[in-house]
Amino acid sequence: MKKNFLFLLALLCTAVQVGWAQSEMDTVYVSKKDHPDAAYFLPEPPDTNSVAFIDDMIQWEWGKSQRNTPRGEQASRETPWLPEIMRTVMAEVLQIDTISDEKTPALSRLLVKSYHTGNQSTVAPKETYSRKRPIVRLNEDTWGKYDSDFLRTNGSYPSGHTAFGWATALAFAEMWPELQDTILRRGVQFGENRIITGAHWQSDVNAGYLCAAASMAKAHTNPDFLKDVLAARAEYAKLKGLPAGYDPVSKADVPHGEDFLNMPVDTASYRYAADVLQFWDAKRLRDTERGKQAEEEADYSVEMMQKVFGEAMGINISPVSTPAICELIELVLNKASETADRLKPIRFRKRPFVQLGEHTTVPEDEEKEKGKSSFPSGHTNLGWSMALVMAEVAPEQQNEILRRGYQYGYNRLIAGYHWASDIEASRLLASALVARLHADLPFLQLVYRARYEFLLNATGITTVLDDQEPASSPAFLLNGIPATPDSHGIIIQNGQKFLVK
């Protein structure tokens, strides 16, 4: 069974291998020009006159309080901006001596390319915003062991360390799901290190996690990524002396948020004040078009996902026209529900409208929802999970898809059903879930079917019923579907011809 599983995955990799240029892609999974545009799908960094900046300041104080502790020592020694630090971190998590090109070439390749992919995901938004770091804004010295004054001229938003740490963690969690929660915990901590050292604000770190997840969604469209995951998995199994047929995928279900996410904010915490203020700040949007959108999208259903992401993808999603995409949406929704629902009773937190004696934008749901936990946000978990998967299905529309996925989570703050910190944690949970889903062969096959379906339904691609033969130009890849073009824009796929206008 194990051999069949790996063989089928290898076939999928081989089928989509053609067309990727090797020069730039030797060290990354996503070229610079193809990264999702974080300046579009994420909000601008909080200004110093904003309510969100209060949370940044509170967390800066928390970070400084950790410095003279073992947690602070960890943050300091993990400040290098090189793949070597991730080699150390992941070797510790995997309980092996080292990850190196010489001794573990497959693990090393997956690590280095994931590292650089995550790191590159923040370059453009850093240049766009040039946000001042805490050490600059507050006239502080650098504190991390390997941090330097270079940071003073490098943008704070988003956090590059967070992005390359979380990207690497997501890749390794997918590679060995049996250890996913331990791997993910270290990925979360690696981002928080930057708050402790004073190199970044909390909002920078939040954005870094999301940049990483978005770019790893794009990485999944590169056939080399799956090949490298499989090679690293086989190498690690051999390194640990595991028996033939050992399957780390079958030994892990959905990620357990209680093992890698922080505890929800308590009312005794200073950060609770920031949650309350952000609740009031979002409430003012209720009588605006943005508030109307939050109210209209309160429905948690397959139909709502079809509507929201169909609009973002520029197609009509329906069981008739896009059965594979509908099947994929239902699968992701069910897994997102499972992931969030199991965590809610474990990490129970009162919802804002209950805690503050308020009403919501959806009063008809208040009675049934008042006894349920605010942490995590099921809607946010669903929206961001779906966005990451649909961005893989339709990378041409990735920025709009990711933007809508982000907004779907923020809706819940406007509506009064969730706290801001719950929403941020839920996006981490979603990223972890998507990594786990990619370890399953049926999921990968469904994504490829959905991709093909999107191409057939997207504007500008129509069936051509002529007898023109394809030219002898090189074969190329349309995200998982081998295709051969001719000089007139004809694509031959599975015996059918399509005209790309």
Residue ranges and their predicted role:
Residues 213, 431-433:
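Catalytic phosphate/nucleotide-handling subdomain of diverse soluble enzymes
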Residues 490-501:
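C-terminal tail/sorting-segment detector
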